[in-house]
């Protein structure tokens, strides 16, 4: 970004409608509370609204922070080789005024995910977990020596 530190990158990140604070706009100035106290410049993944995709040997998992949405505001669909997660809520009041939020995420499913065994759950703290087991192919997946025809 050409403007660098003049404009905080948080404005362009995936924070779903959270308000800006003084430390977002001027992160390099010390706090008025104490010169030794300073807010963290980095937020944790669980607070950020950013998704995490894990593709292990046995399982494919998507973790998504949707704490601003109720279960009725969310929809999860599988279309062909993609999973689509959509969330939308109408205007309502929060700590910073009135806000409406909407997001749409689309992820490609690996070809070896068993689509009939996919599960999706929403935890009490607003973490959506989408996971599906991977089926093992008949082909030997070890990286030992094997002939190539």
Swiss-Prot record:
Binding site for Zn(2+) 2: 96
CDD domains: ACD_alphaA-crystallin_HspB4 (cd06497)
One GO-annotated biological process of the protein: protein refolding
Gene Ontology CC annotations of this record: cytoplasm; nucleus
Residues that, per the record, bind Zn(2+) 1: 89, 91
Gene Ontology MF terms in the entry: metal ion binding; structural constituent of eye lens; unfolded protein binding
Coiled coil: none
Keyword Metal-binding in record: yes
Compartments, as annotated in UniProt: Cytoplasm; Nucleus
Assigned protein family: Belongs to the small heat shock protein (HSP20) family.
Function: Contributes to the transparency and refractive index of the lens. May act as a chaperone, preventing aggregation of various proteins under a wide range of stress conditions.
Protein name: Alpha-crystallin A chain
The encoding gene: CRYAA
């Amino acid at each position: 970004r050409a403007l660098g530190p003049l404009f905080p990158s948080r404005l362009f990140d995936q924070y779903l409608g959270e308000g800006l604070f003084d430390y977002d706009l001027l992160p390099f100035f010390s706090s008025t509370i104490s010169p030794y106290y300073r807010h963290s410049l980095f937020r944790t993944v669980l607070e950020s609204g950013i998704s995490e995709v894990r593709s292990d040997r046995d399982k494919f998992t998507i973790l998504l922070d949707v704490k601003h949405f109720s279960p009725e505001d969310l929809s999860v669909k599988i279309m062909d080789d993609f999973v689509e997660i959509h969330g939308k809520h109408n205007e309502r009041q929060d700590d910073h005024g009135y806000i409406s939020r909407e997001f749409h995420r689309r992820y490609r499913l690996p070809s070896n995910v068993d689509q009939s065994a996919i599960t999706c759950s929403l935890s009490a703290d607003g973490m959506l977990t989408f996971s599906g087991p991977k089926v093992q192919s008949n082909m030997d997946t070890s990286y030992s020596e094997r002939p190539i025809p």
